């Protein structure tokens, strides 16, 4: 009896140790912190005046010039008038946000970092779009629209008009427009980017980082799985490079598999524990792979 009791206690201890080791590898603190890797990029300071090579400026589409709405535009360091460039369009995460790792998100377009990390400041026009309030008069930092309706219509309208406007005025190639986003912005890649047939036509490829439309039910209308599937059906084979901190990308992989929708999906863990798009301001194997993936698409897209 004592032998059986000791054996059970040993098994329990072994299970506890095994569970702890498993948690170390797949838990929220499993991967290294971004602070362990030195940055090789720094966001350009926000400047006033007209857009030009290497400048990061606030702008407003002319249709909204009597409102508080604005977006951010960065023209690549090697930008020249009359030349053509692929475009990275980005949506920010919710804000204000801060976690126990010190990861922060303001929720404003100027807090976005993905596009600059992906481009390194060269070769791509980088456009950070806003989410608009229910009345279309200002930017919002949580979801889109206002509680409880979270009406996306003004957000959609601004994107539909601003992306072609930026391409027309600054040499963006309308056939090579990437859509990326962090957290809320990751969800927005599909929720906003594939919301209807008109906006879905704007993009050549997608890079959602941390969360994915349909995986989890959120507080805004239309976050249910069936609605997300109807949006995903508008993807129509275009490639997506889906990333997440730690092992969270598996939730996206499993949900997409369950939908039965086939496509050109790439799934990668970022290699960091952080819920923070600043990981792309640091060198990493995944950032290198994402850049190569984008370059290949720009070469094959007509």
Question: Language-model features: where?
Answer:
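The feature captures the conserved acid-bearing segment of alpha/beta-hydrolase catalytic domains
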Residues: 198-287
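Gly/Ser-rich "nucleophile elbow"/oxyanion-hole loop immediately N-terminal to the catalytic nucleophile
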Residues: 78-82, 142-183
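A domain-start/cap signature at the N-terminus of enzymes
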Residues: 25-87, 124, 220, 254, ...
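The conserved beta1-alpha1 loop
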Residues: 89-93
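Catalytic active-site module of serine/aspartate enzymes centered on a nucleophile-bearing elbow/loop
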Residues: 284-302
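Short glycine-enriched nucleophile-adjacent loop
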Residues: 186-198
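Active-site machinery of serine-nucleophile hydrolases
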Residues: 94-160
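Short, solvent-exposed loop/turn and secondary-structure capping segments
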Residues: 83-85, 98-104, 137-142, 190-192, ...
